[in-house]
Amino acid sequence: MRSDVIKKGLERVPHRSLLKALGITDDEMRRPFIGIVSSWNEIIPGHVHLDKVVEAVKAGVRMAGGVPFVFPTIGICDGIAMDHRGMKFSLPSRELIADSIEIVASGFPFDGLVFVPNCDKITPGMMMAMGRLNIPSVLISGGPMLAGRYNGRDIDLITVFEAVGGYKVGKVDEETLKAIEDLACPGAGSCAGLFTANTMNSLAEALGIAPRGNGTVPAVHAKRLRMAKEAGMLVVELVKRDVKPRDIVTLDSFMNAVMVDLATGGSTNTVLHLKAIAESFGIDFDIKLFDELSRKIPHICNISPVGPYHIQDLDDAGGIYAVMKRLQENGLLKEDVMTIYLRKIGDLVREAKILNEDVIRPFDNPYHKEGGLGILFGNLAPEGAVAKLSGVPEKMMHHVGPAVVFEDGEEATKAILSGKIKKGDVVVIRYEGPKGGPGMREMLSPTSAIVGMGLAEDVALITDGRFSGGSHGAVIGHVSPEAAEGGPIGIVKDGDLIEIDFEKRTLNLLISDEEFERRMKEFTPLVKEVDSDYLRRYAFFVQSASKGAIFRKP
């Protein structure tokens, strides 16, 4: 066993003595040592209950004959970090999470690992660490929050953000706003729609590294604790069989994950995270795969923020394995990839049942004929940009409008809420990329303001920043290269016409080639003052969003 290096032999007497200080017995020294990575804390609603999930994992490890050891990592709630300096630290936390786990699991040679994340950057950060370490592993998340209820309908955090815009224009009164604030988030779990956290936890199922139901079983259901026990038992079996993450996760696994993402209409952040995770697994993954597959995979699940359903409804309808059954029915699922169950994913999916034909529609009756995400290219995005196609209003699928340029998200939000943005405008928010922010903040407030102000059918937004999984509308993020790296988004001027064609996947600045070249030649990127030692280092090492916003390798 990998842990024998601290347990066996004369030279390891001091090591055993220290382990006995923890209460470890001689019998336990002969068993697999299982590390459990916990991101429990008391400030993230999606993580406040993870101590109970971790206890269930520990029970499962012991049931299977292993010895559990819990160690922590950090986490940030993007919702609470939104609209202030804290959002600059959200995406950078992903790298710290992966690094910290790699450090602990290398300093202590565990035989296996169970990863217990839940929210936006924590799940991908843990998956990156899993790929790097390549130790037998299982991921079990904390699960989604239940939707809130107000006035006879389900609501969630995005309802709150959009209600703020509605209040500004008199569509929502103060009493209603307060009621929505009080009721939208009823308890523990990751926010209730198909936002980034729930998308990533769902894609972990499709990758084969998490138990069935990982992405959809609500946080407060007892089934979540049973799944956590199962995760603890599964990892011990993987250790005994010496099955490692790279034996499970292949390019075909990523293709399954992308297809699930497109079929469900997942978060745009998945493009960023899947690219980074693939790099950690040593897999060559081109983001163009999203666009190639989106032409084949229809959008079949209409889940918040683009539809009326929530994750609990998807769970009731059969969950992610039922979505994969639709792929299987149409001959698209990559069936031969392995899973943590030591069974092929195709065999497991055959056992799945689709329990609601409206929540998970057949391919011949989709919500949209193409997948939920698209990659756009053009003279404004030579390395690509990302759009949530399932959230684009029909009349905005092709749009030409004048640019209104902002150098950060706060400026843009103030302008939108004060009525300075008019129908037809294209809001351009730049210097919000990985390097320029630094930290590639989410632009949830400006997009929610556009929706709340009743402009979603008439205003587009493009940015080198990114979006919350809750953003929707004619919005395009991850524009690469970013302005801080000399990208063309940096040369846009107020009043320039911008053409967006979601159908053709193009994003272009409508100026002459000569003018374009002149501006690019004369362009000097703005350099922002950075008041954080870590963010200065992050900005120095981070790469483009098109490369997953991972660090440059020495």
Swiss-Prot record:
Q: Which residues bind [2Fe-2S] cluster?
A: 119, 191
GO CC term (a single one): cytosol
Active site, UniProt feature: 468
The UniProt note on the cofactor reads as follows: Binds 1 [2Fe-2S] cluster per subunit. This cluster acts as a Lewis acid cofactor.
Catalytic activity from the UniProt record:
(2R)-2,3-dihydroxy-3-methylbutanoate = 3-methyl-2-oxobutanoate + H2O; (2R,3R)-2,3-dihydroxy-3-methylpentanoate = (S)-3-methyl-2-oxopentanoate + H2O
Residues that coordinate or bind Mg(2+): 78, 120-121, 442
The record's subunit annotation is:
Homodimer.
Q: Which family does it belong to?
A: Belongs to the IlvD/Edd family.
Report the function annotation for this chain. Answer: Functions in the biosynthesis of branched-chain amino acids. Catalyzes the dehydration of (2R,3R)-2,3-dihydroxy-3-methylpentanoate (2,3-dihydroxy-3-methylvalerate) into 2-oxo-3-methylpentanoate (2-oxo-3-methylvalerate) and of (2R)-2,3-dihydroxy-3-methylbutanoate (2,3-dihydroxyisovalerate) into 2-oxo-3-methylbutanoate (2-oxoisovalerate), the penultimate precursor to L-isoleucine and L-valine, respectively.
Tell me the protein's name. Answer: Dihydroxy-acid dehydratase
Organism lineage string: Bacteria, Thermotogati, Thermotogota, Thermotogae, Thermotogales
